[in-house]
Amino acid sequence: MAVKEIKYYAEAREKIMAGVDTLADAVKVTLGPRGRNVVLEKSWGPPTVTKDGVTVAKEIDLEDKFENMGAQMVKEVASKTSDVAGDGTTTATILAQAIYRAGSKLVSAGHNPMALKRGIELAVAAAVRELRNMSKPTKDQKEIAQVGTISANNDVAIGDIIAEAMNKVGKEGVITVEEAKSMETTLEVVEGMQFDRGYVSPYFVTDPERMEVVLEDPYILINEKKISNMKDLLPVLEQIAKMGAPLLIVAEDVEGEALATLVVNKLRGTLKVSAVKAPGFGDRRKAMLEDLAVLTGGKVVSEDIGVKLENVSLQDLGRAKTVRIDKDNTTIVDGAGARSAIEARVKQIRAQIDETTSDYDREKLQERLAKIVGGVAVVRVGAATETEMKEKKARVEDALNATRAAVEEGIVPGGGVALLRCLPALEKLDLHGEDAFGVKIVMRALEEPVRQIANNAGHEGSVVVQQVKQGTGSHGFNADTEVYEDLSAAGVIDPTKVVRFALQNAASVASLLLTTEAMIAEKPKKQKPAPAMPGAGMEDMY
């Protein structure tokens, strides 16, 4: 069994502080519009350049096991804030460092860490209430663009693209970020329901120049199983031929005799028809076919519910205004489903999103929801080099997360001012003894983001903090223009959700560290020197 090494009391706290400082000092240089980049060495490929706090934090592992424990705990603050709010990781790290530093001094001076923890929790609860009172909902696309711009390190183009994407697909829509093949950053919006299945045969193409199938006002047959026997398909094809309308077949697969007959009839001009494979696999495929049926007002042909393909009538088929199919994707625009049925389906998917514990399932459910209600927007990020593209893509993802958070819970003044404006609420807390010291720890920590933003801009942090404290509302220091002004009017705003989670997560981990009095780690094993190589009887040879 491995031998353990134990550190107690002041020695343990010093080790934690060293680890916290090492990680936080590397992360906090990135804060604010004048924050610097951090270069990360990779085991393969070029180094990564980033200004994202959580990316820097995740790269840090320290040689000293006790210091590393402190660093890993603060890394957890950044990761948790990133997972839940999507941004604010640097702020969270700075707050955790400030709370632990002030608290550990008081513990060393003889204060009770459990009472300090209680005071910290009461102070954070009061600050969160004040943030919620301060918060305002996002009014328009301009404010969403401002949030995105601030989060993307003052890149106005990124802010505008994300605001446009949010405007096009709504807050329920899915916005994905991909690497472009050119130097331009562009936005592509897919309206309607799109899934990643193309035509089964290129013979179905109606636009040879673009290699696309375009069907106007088609009927849509949704079949759960494979279709290979023409006899099963014949009754519905006869009804469609009489109507003279186009037909889209969505099935697990269309093959053999059935596919050959469809292709021949399409080439002769007897039928306007196309076939695509059903999206997804297993239970997810069933759910997506049901979504498609609800959206188009049709029914899923499935033997599970006693419906056979040969018995299908036109009433069982879905309708849509337009269907576009290329070799990779199918897009269905303006499905004819009943509004009430679509709303019921949306409500059901939202309930599943709330209930699921799997991040993967939640992501897939949100994609399904977006396809029914909003649509999908793709931001294609372009840059001159691969290194720049990766850095820019990370900033776009940060900005996207921040704008979603802003739409969800509203916005507060940026630049660390919102946290400073919580100080009067903390001063009003009527606490005595050790609890009051816990509140003072948080009050000191709330100044730290403004101080660090000013330091990174080349100003004296303490002077800036005092100046901002004398103001009211959203009056603060704009580190980009280096002037004191109304930050909300200047477009320097933060999502309430991001600021709230940064404070709550920082206080949670820092107060846990404060109550630590012993640390246990595996003792490093002494490496035995390798034995000398034998001379093999050749010592005297030169």
From Swiss-Prot:
GO terms for cellular component: cytoplasm. GO terms for biological process: protein refolding. CDD domains: GroEL. GO terms for molecular function: ATP binding; ATP-dependent protein folding chaperone; isomerase activity; unfolded protein binding. Keywords: ATP-binding, Chaperone, Cytoplasm, Isomerase, Nucleotide-binding. Gene3D superfamilies: GroEL, GroEL-like equatorial domain, TCP-1-like chaperonin intermediate domain. It catalyses: ATP + H2O + a folded polypeptide = ADP + phosphate + an unfolded polypeptide. Together with its co-chaperonin GroES, plays an essential role in assisting protein folding. The GroEL-GroES system forms a nano-cage that allows encapsulation of the non-native substrate proteins and provides a physical environment optimized to promote and accelerate protein folding. Belongs to the chaperonin (HSP60) family. This is Chaperonin GroEL 2. It comes from Syntrophobacter fumaroxidans (strain DSM 10017 / MPOB).
